[in-house]
């Protein structure tokens, strides 16, 4: 079966579905790392964040794609130890899909919308407006590279995003 488009899961329509105790076979999250770069260095003077502007659900595949993109841009521009990046959301929400049979004779096999609760197909993170998704800490000279990396990460997410400077705004003006 093909993966459904993200627009099917983007909007928050029903109440949260997170109790894995009662679900059989929840697929694991594809997000592997939540902290990247120089984890020991806490003295980076500039911190910038990627903020979502609308309430939505972000699939774990989109979070992983955004993380990989931002990490690749930062490593290429600042080096492996020139930044610290943190992914600040976790995909708790379990996404379901009511599989539909297609093709010849599907009407005999399929039950349509009867028992349409669906099977678990993935996980997603529910975010609120103005919630931080990624935070990047860098040196002053690497500010533009970090901003560009967050912009590229925002392009992978299903909601409009904005980049804000958390610390060190006076250094980068």
From Swiss-Prot:
Top-level taxon of origin: Archaea
Any one cellular-component term (Gene Ontology): cytosolic large ribosomal subunit
Task: Name the InterPro entries on file.
Answer: Ribosomal_uL16 (IPR047873), Ribosomal_uL16_arc (IPR022981), Ribosomal_uL16_CS_euk_arc (IPR018255), Ribosomal_uL16_dom (IPR016180), Ribosomal_uL16_euk_arch (IPR001197), Ribosomal_uL16_sf (IPR036920)
Query: Per its record, what are the GO molecular function terms?
Result: structural constituent of ribosome
For this protein, the record's CDD domains field holds: Ribosomal_L16_L10e
Sorted alphabetically, the Gene Ontology BP terms of this entry are: translation
Keywords attached to this entry: Ribonucleoprotein, Ribosomal protein
Q: Pfam families this protein is in?
A: Ribosomal_L16
Regarding protein family, the annotation reads: Belongs to the universal ribosomal protein uL16 family.
Mind telling me which NCBIfam families this protein's record contains?
A: PRK04199.1-3 (NF003238), PRK04199.1-4 (NF003239), uL16_euk_arch (TIGR00279)
Could you identify this protein by its name?
Answer: Large ribosomal subunit protein uL16
Gene behind this chain?
A: rpl10e
């Amino acid at each position: 079966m093909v993966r459904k488009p993200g627009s099917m899961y983007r909007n928050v329509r029903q109440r949260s579905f997170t109790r894995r105790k009662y679900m059989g076979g929840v697929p694991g999250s594809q997000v592997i790392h939540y902290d990247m770069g120089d984890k020991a260095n806490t003295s980076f003077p500039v911190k910038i964040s990627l903020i979502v502007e609308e309430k939505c659900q972000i699939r774990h595949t989109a979070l992983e794609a955004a993380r990989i993109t931002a990490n690749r841009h930062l490593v290429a521009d600042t080096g492996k130890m020139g930044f610290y990046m943190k992914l600040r959301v976790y995909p708790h929400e379990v996404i379901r899909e009511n599989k539909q049979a297609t093709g010849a004779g599907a009407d005999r096999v399929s039950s349509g919308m009867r028992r349409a609760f669906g099977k678990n197909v993935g996980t997603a993170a529910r975010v609120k407006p103005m919630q931080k998704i990624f935070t990047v800490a860098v040196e002053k000279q690497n500010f533009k590279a970090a901003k560009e990396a967050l912009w590229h990460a925002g392009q992978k997410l299903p909601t409009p995003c904005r980049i804000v400077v958390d610390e060190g705004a006076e250094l980068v003006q």
